[in-house]
Amino acid sequence: MARISGVDIPRNKRVEISLTYIYGIGRTTSTEILARTNINPNVRVKDLTEDEVIRLREIIDQDYTVEGDLRRAVQLNIKRLMDIGCYRGIRHRKGLPLRGQRTKTNARTRRGKKGAAIGGKKKATKK
């Protein structure tokens, strides 16, 4: 398995798809990288030469923020929003949607699961 940016990319998939296993690289970025390195996107990872893998590694490491660095940057951006107390930061803190979606109903993904509904028990009548 080729290891790029600390991620083992799948050997049996096309290079274009395999690169998307790296956090921060999607299909568009993947095709862009392959165009810059002059690698055919339809080639399987197992068929890449060592030189091609090295070229991929160099371009990704030099020009793209991926994996841990990108995750850290996103977390710091969210933390900054929460620290300055802006609307988006408050919504992050409360665990609610940020972009104006309704919350009276829906928003389940952001708000989390509700507990199981427990029906009221009937009290035994005295005879």
Curated annotation (Swiss-Prot):
Region annotated Disordered, chain positions: 95-127
InterPro entries according to UniProt: Rbsml_uS13_C (IPR027437), Ribosomal_uS13 (IPR001892), Ribosomal_uS13-like_H2TH (IPR010979), Ribosomal_uS13_bac-type (IPR019980), Ribosomal_uS13_CS (IPR018269)
Keywords, ordered alphabetically: Ribonucleoprotein, Ribosomal protein, RNA-binding, rRNA-binding, tRNA-binding
GO CC list: cytosol; small ribosomal subunit
UniProt KW RNA-binding keyword: yes
Keyword Ribonucleoprotein found: yes
Family: Belongs to the universal ribosomal protein uS13 family.
Subunit structure, as described in the record: Part of the 30S ribosomal subunit. Forms a loose heterodimer with protein S19. Forms two bridges to the 50S subunit in the 70S ribosome.
Function: Located at the top of the head of the 30S subunit, it contacts several helices of the 16S rRNA. In the 70S ribosome it contacts the 23S rRNA (bridge B1a) and protein L5 of the 50S subunit (bridge B1b), connecting the 2 subunits; these bridges are implicated in subunit movement. Contacts the tRNAs in the A and P-sites.
Name of the molecule in the record: Small ribosomal subunit protein uS13
The encoding gene: rpsM
